[in-house]
Amino acid sequence: MAALATLPPLPPQFKSIQHHLRTAQEHDKRDPVVAYYCRLYAMQTGMKIDSKTPECRKFLSRLMDQLEALKKQLGDNEAITQEIVGSAHLENYALKMFLYADNEDRAGRFHKNMIKSFYTASLLIDVITVFGELTDENVKHRKYARWKATYIHNCLKNGETPQAGPVGIEEDNVDVEEYEDAGATSLPTQPLQPSSSTYDPSNMPSSSYTGIQIPPGAHAPANTPAEVPHSTGVTSNTIQPTPQTIPAIDPALFSTVSQGDIRLTPEDFARAQKYCKYAGSALQYEDVSTAVQNLQKALKLLTTGRE
C-alpha cells in the first residue's frame, strides 16, 4: 500500500482523537480497513470539536486527503463499500483483540501486549460508532477494556500484582488519562519500531506503547505477518494462539421449520442478515467458532422469531 501524506502537528483541541489516529497508523499495513475507519472516526469527531480554527481546518483537510487516498487504494473492498460488512469487520476485529487480552488476563499473564490489546479494543469500539449507536454489549466491553488497561498498567508501574479476571470496576480510583498520557502527547513522526515485551515503566516507549506488536492468531487476520522484533537477547513473552473450539450445533435447529403463526418483522430480517455478515467476516479471520455461533443465531431467529 502506498504511503499516505504526512499529517501536520496535532492541534491541542484534538487530543482526544490522537490515540485513534495512532491506532490507524499501526494498522495501515496490518489491516487497512481498520486503519480507514479509525481515520474516519477521527475525522468525524474532529469536525465536531473544532472545524473553524485555522490549524484544525488544516489538520482535518490533510486527514481528509488520507481518507480519500485510502478509499481509492481499497477500491471495491466490500468492508468499505458496504456499511454492514464494514461494521461486522470492525466489530469482529475489536472483539478478537478484547478476547485475546481477556484470556491473557484470566490466565494471570500480565504484559504490555495484553495492556495494549485491552486499550486498543476500547478505541476500536469507539470507532464502531461511525455506524451508529453501540449495542449494550459493546458499551460494557469498552468500559471494561479501558478500565482493565489502566488498572493493570498502574499495578505494574507500582510494582503490584494485578488481580486476574473480572473484578469490580472502581472508575473513581483509576485515572484513564494517566495511561493515555504515559508517553508523548503528539503523534509519532518516525516509523513504528518493535519493542521488548519486558515491562519496565521507567523505560516506556515515547509514543505510549506504540511499538508493541500484537501477535497474529489471537486476533489478527490469518494472513497478517507477525511483526516481531529481531533477537535482542531479551526474553519475551511468546503468545501461542489457542486451539479453536467449535461450539456444538443444536440438532433441533436443523429440524425446526417456520410455523405459520411466526411473523418476522423487517428488523428481524435485518438482524439475521447482520449475523450472516458477522459470520462471513469471522471466516476471513479463520474464526470458525464465531462464524458458527453467528449462523446459529441467524437460523434460530429466522425459524423461531426469537434470539
Curated annotation (Swiss-Prot):
Residue stretches of biased makeup (Polar residues):
199-211
- Spell out the residue ranges making up region: Interaction with IST1: 2-187
The coiled-coil regions, if any, are none
> Which region ranges are annotated with the description Interaction with CHMP5?
2-75
For the modification N-acetylalanine, the affected residues are 2
Q: Name one GO cellular component term.
A: endosome membrane
Spell out the Low complexity composition-biased ranges.
185-198
Q: Where is this region: Disordered?
A: 180-240
One matching Pfam family, short form? Vta1_C
Q: Where is this region: Interaction with VPS4B?
A: 198-307
Question: How is this protein positioned relative to the membrane?
Answer: Peripheral membrane protein
> Which key words tag this protein in UniProt?
Acetylation, Cytoplasm, Endosome, Membrane, Protein transport, Transport
Q: Where in the cell is it found?
A: Cytoplasm; Endosome membrane
Q: Which GO terms describe its biological process?
A: late endosome to vacuole transport via multivesicular body sorting pathway; protein transport
- Describe its function: Involved in the endosomal multivesicular bodies (MVB) pathway. MVBs contain intraluminal vesicles (ILVs) that are generated by invagination and scission from the limiting membrane of the endosome and mostly are delivered to lysosomes enabling degradation of membrane proteins, such as stimulated growth factor receptors, lysosomal enzymes and lipids. Thought to be a cofactor of VPS4A/B, which catalyzes disassembles membrane-associated ESCRT-III assemblies. Involved in the sorting and down-regulation of EGFR.
For this chain, the family text in UniProt reads: Belongs to the VTA1 family.
Under the subunit heading, UniProt states:
Interacts with VPS4B. Interacts with CHMP1B. Interacts with CHMP2A; the interaction probably involves the open conformation of (polymerized) CHMP2A. Interacts with CHMP3. Interacts with CHMP5; the interaction involves soluble CHMP5. Interacts with IST1.
Provide the protein name: Vacuolar protein sorting-associated protein VTA1 homolog
Provenance organism = Bos taurus (Bovine)
